[in-house]
Every structure is written in structure tokens, then in C-alpha cells.
Amino acid sequence: MAALVSRHTEHFATAPQIGPHDLVEIAAMGFKTVVNNRPDGEGGAEQPPNAEIEAAAKAAGLNYAYLPVISGQITEQQARDFAHLLATAPGPLLAFCRSGARSQNLYQLAGMVASSAPASRQ
């Protein structure tokens, strides 16, 4: 599993599809939050259901979020939701999808929407 993780920053990494059996190792690698960006059923019978991955993540002491996105169809709201997760979820954070590329694209879009957000009024 460690060889498949791509670290983008000290606080963020991506990975291809993980399974429930990977969560203990992910926790041992120091991650605090796991985000599933892959819609349930997208990969057919070989893809573990979100509920199984979430249960294994929680059993391993990890925070978990499900933010499914469709490749090539990421919305601005999904990018904003991901930016919120990045800002509020305990890190480091590991996001995954089928190959890791969709999670990386979502991360880049989240950075764009976060940097374009108007400053809060005081």
C-alpha cells in the first residue's frame, strides 16, 4: 500500500482504490482522515462498497468521509466541499478513487475555489 500512495503535500496524499484490509496500514502510515471519492458500484463487483471501507476505517481509528465524484464531471460544489474537508478534517488526509487521478484533480480544484473565495467580513 505505501508504494501506491502519492504524497502531494505534508498534509495530503492520494491513492488508487483501497479495500477494507488496507485501513490498518493506512492508519499506521500516520493518516488521520480517509476520503472516498469513488461512487459506489462504479467498478462492479470488484469494488468494495463504501460502507465496508468506512467501517474498517472507523475500526482503525480513522476519520472517514464519502465525497463521490464522477471523472470529468466534478462540480464547483464538490470542489468546495472537498476544500472544506481539507480545512477542517484532521490530517494528514488520504483521498482515493479508482486510480488516484480523480482525487488529485479534486484537490487541485479545491485549491482554486478556496483561493477565489471572498474574504470573510469581520
Regions inferred by a protein language model and the residue ranges of each:
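Short cysteine clusters
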Residues: C97
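Cys-dependent protein tyrosine phosphatase-like superfamily
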Residues: M1-L94, N105-Q122
